[in-house]
Amino acid sequence: MTKSVGDEESQYIEDPSFAAAAAFTGGRDGVSYSNQRFAEGSGHSSDLAKSLEDYRPPDEKPSSLSSVGEGGANEEEKGGNDGGPLARIQTGLFSPRLRNHRKKILSKFVLNNFFIACVCVSLISIYWGACYGTDRYFFKVKNIVVLQDAPSNTSVQSISAIIPSLLASVPGTWHIYNATSFHRKFGTTNSTEIDRKIVDLIYDERYWLALNVKPNATDTLYNSLISQDANSEFNSSIFFESVFESGRDPSSVKSTILPLMQQLEVRLQKYYVKEYLPSLMSNITSNDRDLNINMENWAIAGQLLFTYNDYRPFADRILMAPLQVGLIYCILLTVLQLSLYGKLHGEMARVLKPKHILIYRLLISWATYFLLSIGFCTVSAIFRIDFTPAFGRGGFVVYWMSTWLVMMAVGGANENVLSLVIAYCPPYLSIWLMTWIILNISASFYPMVLNNEFYRYGYIMPIHNAVDIYKVIFLNLTKRKMGRNYGILVAWVALNTSLMPFCMKFAGKKMQKNAMQAAEAAVAAATQRASRPAEANTDKNNNPPGN
């Protein structure tokens, strides 16, 4: 059956995003027939035929036109009008012909490096800023101090009485209670309930640090000083307990927040050794000159130390992999799967209806994330990470399903944005990837209380909520926030899914426009070449091509 040039041109315009490929690889019949029409001198069809002839591979072309030099003149030809091929002549970098090219190179070099410098200053500074000026935000670190000690001897001042004054010079926001006010505030009735409630407050993340000064601290010290019984020695670590959870933030609790409690300990030690204990000993000896002193008890009483109880310790360094850098790889994996499916997505887009394209893309993406997530989680299992602290033997399944949800959240955003970036500005693809990673990790790897208010956007970022969930799985932290964490991740999946049709539509229109512009440029170039003198297309015997 005869195939008209008009049909070939119609296909070229109807599917512009694949026009060049169709003309280059699948349109050989069209090329040969178009050449015949060109020889016959047809009008517009000859232009298209010439354009298709130019897109043929070099080994299939009977000849190629000479290249145009910088000044517009044809460069040196190899072969000429004897039917031999024409080719570009390569030259040196410092050739006078490349003067304009050298200017272009210099201009691009300056502009590109200026742009990269701006990216470094604007994007990377976001991450650096999350670690900068930490001491300026200590006022947001809430801590609690409970002073249960109340001496039975009213003539003796409590050891802990000075603590409120000392806290005035220690950074942080300190909430101070005695036993009575604590009972009234939190509904406890005795010392045991106070001890338990303090641990619960730290576990529920109401406070970062707690100091619990237990009852009878001063009485025990006083009795050890006046008693000859060696068993009545004063052990300060029994009465001064500091409670915290290093697992709440492995990078900052021990290195940045816990030193606040240690500052208080140092100040209290200094006061105790230089003022309180000498005054107490002086009162004891002046009131009872015949007292037989147990010098060992007096020596032991000369030191005051806190007990530091870490109820959720961060003890296994391998956990830094899934809790921090591993989440960056999680983002990158979602981009990898998108690039691997790119060619297939293009093929399916030509044969599926718009509605079914959306269904196909969602099914492929979610199924891929499902398998990617189990592979990602298996790496943690290979390195013997414990999944059981919070959910027992089901911990791995919780980790797997959570990772799948995280991948759908970050991957869906990548898929939508990258489709627009590729359509409108492909060179900036890496800029989006850097931006997405930095925005996520800057507000996730460090506690909000030690950052500027700017970083509060992190509460809605997928990686921040993933970190909170993983800390529960691996470190058995409070589950109080898990509902919010999962809700935000589901919201991301829903948002990405609802935006996908619009992103695909805008990207498709832009790519279609780009393809049409390329097609018009090709036709214009073909028209210009076809308008050259007829003798430029004849061989040395003045025979038309194909005869």
UniProtKB/Swiss-Prot annotation:
Its main location: membrane. The chain crosses the membrane at residues 109-129, 159-179, 318-338, 363-383, 394-414, 418-438, 457-477, 488-508. GO terms for biological process: nucleobase-containing compound transport; regulation of fungal-type cell wall organization; regulation of phospholipid translocation. Residues 526-536 have a biased composition (Low complexity). The modification Phosphothreonine is found at T91. It is found in: Membrane. It is a multi-pass membrane protein. Pfam families: DUF3533 (PF12051). Induction: Transcriptionally regulated by PDR8. Keywords: Membrane, Phosphoprotein, Transmembrane, Transmembrane helix. Residues 50-62 have a biased composition (Basic and acidic residues). It comes from the Eukaryota. One of its GO terms (cellular component) is plasma membrane. To yeast YJR015W. May function as a N-methyl-N'nitro-N-nitrosoguanidine (MNNG) export permease. This is Nitrosoguanidine resistance protein SNG1. It comes from Saccharomyces cerevisiae (strain ATCC 204508 / S288c) (Baker's yeast). The lineage of its organism: Eukaryota, Fungi, Dikarya, Ascomycota, Saccharomycotina.
